[in-house]
């Protein structure tokens, strides 16, 4: 099995378990416990599902962490021997919030050409896919792309900065914690909807995925990675303040520790290996012609090593 593993994550507390894994060297610990004491672990950070998918396809990393939408697109693209990408576990259920600083925008129906919506990657990011699902819910499947022309690709921290500045063309932001929390403290910014409204309940936002070749050739390494993720989840649950301290130490973000603890402890946020509501996203992407292959259940998107989880 390999003696080095490279992982990429993105921005926000929906990646918190991975930040904890890096800081606490949990993969190294779990690998050592499995007879691999010299495991080298390298972490990178990118923005948007497209870029983490490209990193995996280019063999620049062994594991990518990204939204359920980008996973499904990659699963579809790499099926039948072209990499056969699947998820090894879920990372987080975190609501994404669509915010606006245009007082005229109370619901999706109020968006017009006067609005520009920042999100991590147009068309492909989980925010973009959820916006399409919301549009399809409101206007029918044929109109799922109705709001796409208003969207702009932008890193969450930059989108938040634009919203809070009150300047520039960006007057809406589809984001997640901690950025939505920070923005909503500004009285000029309000919530239009969140992803749990669209999915009808909690939904996994982030999953961890790799190729079949890597997964099958390195079962002990994969076991160590998933065990490390599980350990991180336990630490977050047992000690949210410690998790918040780790997040701030690694990311150097400017959120207050108390705000972070409140977010991490929110009943709407869950860090666990079992996925929630991933299958409806696969159905939507297939129905709207974005992916060719039809998943028959959430298990199609995950390696058999994850099938014992009580997922959806």
PLM regions with names:
Residues 148, 157-249:
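Pocket-lining segment of extracytoplasmic ligand-binding domains
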Residues 36-41, 142-149, 251-263, 292-298:
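Short, surface-exposed acidic
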